[in-house]
Amino acid sequence: MEIKDLQDYVAIVNDWPKKGIVFKDITPLMNDGEAYRFATDKIVEYAKELKIDIIVGPEARGFIIGCPVAYALGIGFAPVRKPGKLPRETIEMEYDLEYGTNKLSMHSDAIKPGQRVLITDDLLATGGTIEATIKLVEELGGIVAGCAFLIELKELEGHKKLNGYDRLILMKL
């Protein structure tokens, strides 16, 4: 398998979750053991190069990408969630959506100062989620060593919010 083959495992769903949206569904990739392992292994290789201490992923698909990477590396995983979903003390970060704002939260003890962090997610779109996640990690004293995505939606230019941050993008659609 090659990276270019991964696109065969992304289903395009028109008008979901609402009219006018073209959704990139990664469940076919997850359903295929060879493709899922291949994508995970590429991110593991990237994380090894960066000497990562911990993986951070926003809910929910960031968990799907990040947890197997953390497991393969024998390191921890720290979830980033919507407010009110984590049971202990958290920090929060607001970010902009196309129409309004949203918030993400993280346990306030999830990252130790100086830890090298890899942020994982399935998709880089506008960059709002990744930007807020970076701010959460840095507020806790973590070093964002890199960001890894299965897919970047090129036309939404989310990569502009990652200036100065190393990144791995397996597919640009």
Swiss-Prot record:
Q: Which gene encodes it?
A: apt
Pfam families for this protein: Pribosyltran
Q: Where in the cell is it found?
A: Cytoplasm
One MF term from GO for this chain? adenine phosphoribosyltransferase activity
Q: Which organism is it from?
A: Listeria monocytogenes serovar 1/2a (strain ATCC BAA-679 / EGD-e)
Chief localization: cytoplasm
Q: Quote the catalytic activity from the record.
A: AMP + diphosphate = 5-phospho-alpha-D-ribose 1-diphosphate + adenine
Q: What is this protein called?
A: Adenine phosphoribosyltransferase
- EC numbers listed for it are 2.4.2.7
Stored SUPFAM superfamilies: PRTase-like
Q: Does the keyword Transferase apply?
A: yes
* GO cellular-component term (any): cytoplasm
Record text on subunit structure and interactions = Homodimer.
Tell me the disulfide pairings in this chain.
none
Any single biological process term in GO: purine ribonucleoside salvage
Q: Which pathway does this polypeptide act in? A: Purine metabolism; AMP biosynthesis via salvage pathway; AMP from adenine: step 1/1
* Enzymatic class: transferase
Q: Which UniProt keywords apply?
A: Cytoplasm, Glycosyltransferase, Purine salvage, Transferase
Q: What is the protein's known function? A: Catalyzes a salvage reaction resulting in the formation of AMP, that is energically less costly than de novo synthesis.
Question: What Gene3D superfamilies does the annotation carry?
Answer: 3.40.50.2020
